[in-house]
Regions:
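Alpha-helical interaction/regulatory segments in DNA maintenance proteins
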Residues: 2-26, 127, 312-315
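Transmembrane beta-strand segments of Gram-negative outer membrane beta-barrel proteins
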Residues: 18-54, 72, 76-82, 118, ...
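Short loop/turn motifs that connect adjacent beta-strands in outer-membrane beta-barrel proteins
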Residues: 20-26, 76-77, 109-118, 127, ...
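Outer-membrane beta-barrel translocator/receptor signature
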Residues: 39, 46-52, 56-68, 72-80, ...
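Outer-membrane beta-barrel and related beta-rich outer-membrane complex signature
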Residues: 43, 130-134, 187-200, 250-254, ...
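Exposed, low-structure sequence patches enriched in small/polar residues
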Residues: 59, 63, 164, 220-255, ...
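Surface-exposed extracellular loop regions of Gram-negative outer-membrane beta-barrel proteins
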Residues: 66-100, 106, 136-146, 243-292
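Outer membrane beta-barrel
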Residues: 96-190, 312-325
Length: 413
């Protein structure tokens, strides 16, 4: 009897050796220098009387922007590097800065036995649909068709951005069908403080050009710890995440109506379930999360059906209660935050010809609680139609029509 048996080959990961890393790794150094061709008001020295009344009218540093980045990469298994940056107007080597204003270091190791990922220094996280933790990039309304695998991810952070990352250690392990991730972060951050020393809001622009902006630099520390466990099969995955944050100062929500359900403590706890099922042309994924403050919750679910390689359809539902608080949440939304929003999105994509692609979507959104400038519930709708035509190998034409209507104070949309 003669028979043939075929199976996927077992890939053996090579051992990482110092000699190999030094010889075959890729080193890269890049730098950027921006020289403005005009003089902004912040660099003009005002009269002494004006300067005494408002010292924040003058930038403390020169008008040059500069950064330098070093990165090392060995295949897709080992990465490390650092970044140093000075924004235009920030002091260099003075006012407490050790040369540059901001520094960042990252180290990432992948695929060493059961250890899938190890990150040290600065890193990014993504779990589920981002309702609990997501410091990675979120999809826009026109890119939902391109969404890939939503498995938990730990990635290196090598950007010049001074927000949307964690600093510490993170690790992911795989035991058969179970993925386990754990992380800890200690991160100094910027904040605007009230007179009593509580946090009014977190400052995210990373600019420290004036005395006022410097006074907000790293005046708060954020400690974060969390874990995620995900069970995977060929067609289905189910995961649970728990995330805890502690700030060195308490938040203060203020007295404004729209801020009534804003953060008002220094400790925050979030937990969520994320799930995904895919089979042939259909895929469904989502997440449901809860927060300890105000008892809020949030859920987001989306489905994609591909009729064939030319036609596909997507639908997305979201419901974020106004009591939900997720300071590290980042997901699909109209209002830019995972709170006080519900809505339904549907879109289609068609390629009747190889050179032609048509896409359209409609998104309806509703805000059940007051927003800044709108002291009542509000709603809106957005629709887009786009045509992409590949004329030749060198030319591509695109056209887009977009309609968006949002309710304003005292005016229906």
């Amino acid at each position: 009897t003669l028979f043939v048996y075929v199976e996927n080959p077992v890939e053996e990961k090579e051992k990482l050796r110092l000699k190999t890393l030094l010889k075959e790794g890729r080193h890269e150094v890049t730098s950027r220098l921006d020289v403005p061709l005009y003089k902004r008001d912040g660099y003009k020295i005002p009269e002494d009387e004006v300067l005494l009344k408002n010292p924040n009218k003058v930038y403390l540093g020169n008008s040059l922007y500069h950064n330098i980045r070093y990165t090392y990469q060995y295949r897709n298994r080992l990465f490390w590097g650092f970044t140093a940056e000075k924004d235009a107007g920030e002091p260099f080597g003075s006012y407490g800065n050790k040369a540059y204003d901001a520094y960042s270091f990252h180290f990432l190791l992948k695929d060493c036995g059961k250890l899938k990922t190890l990150a040290l220094g600065d890193y990014r996280l993504g779990f589920g649909e981002g309702l609990v933790v997501n410091s990675d990039f979120s999809l826009g309304k026109s890119t939902l068709f391109n969404m890939g695998d939503t498995r938990p991810s730990i990635k290196k952070f090598s950007s010049t951005s001074e927000t949307s990352f964690f600093r510490g250690i993170a690790a992911a392990f795989r035991f058969g069908r179970v993925d386990m991730s754990a992380f800890y972060s200690y991160l100094p951050t910027d904040a605007t403080l009230r007179k009593d020393g509580t946090i009014s809001s977190l400052k995210t622009d990373g600019l420290h050009r004036t005395l006022l902006e410097l006074s907000k630099k790293h005046n708060v520390t954020e400690q974060s710890v969390g874990t995620d466990v995900t069970w995977n099969t060929e067609y289905f995955s189910l995961g649970a995440i728990v995330f805890y944050q502690h700030f060195s100062r308490s938040f203060s929500k203020g007295t404004e109506l729209y801020r009534q359900y804003y953060p008002d403590e220094k400790d925050f706890l979030n937990a969520g379930l994320h799930y995904r099922w895919h089979r042939d042309r259909f895929s469904f994924s989502g997440e449901t999360a809860f927060s300890n403050m105000y008892g809020g919750w949030a859920t987001l679910n989306k489905a994609i059906y591909r009729f064939n390689h030319r036609y596909s359809m997507v639908a997305l539902q979201r419901l974020f209660t106004y009591q939900y608080v997720g300071l590290r949440a980042n997901s699909f939304s109209e209002g830019g935050a995972v709170r006080n929003e519900s809505g339904f999105y549907t879109g289609v994509e068609a390629s009747p010809l190889n050179e032609l692609k048509l896409s359209a979507y409609v998104d309806y959104f509703y805000f059940p609680w007051a927003k800044f400038g709108i002291p009542h519930t509000s709603e809106g709708v957005e629709g887009t139609f786009q045509v992409d035509w590949v004329v030749s190998g060198k030319w591509e034409l695109s056209g887009r029509y977009q309609l968006k209507r949002k309710e304003r104070y005292g005016q229906p949309y």
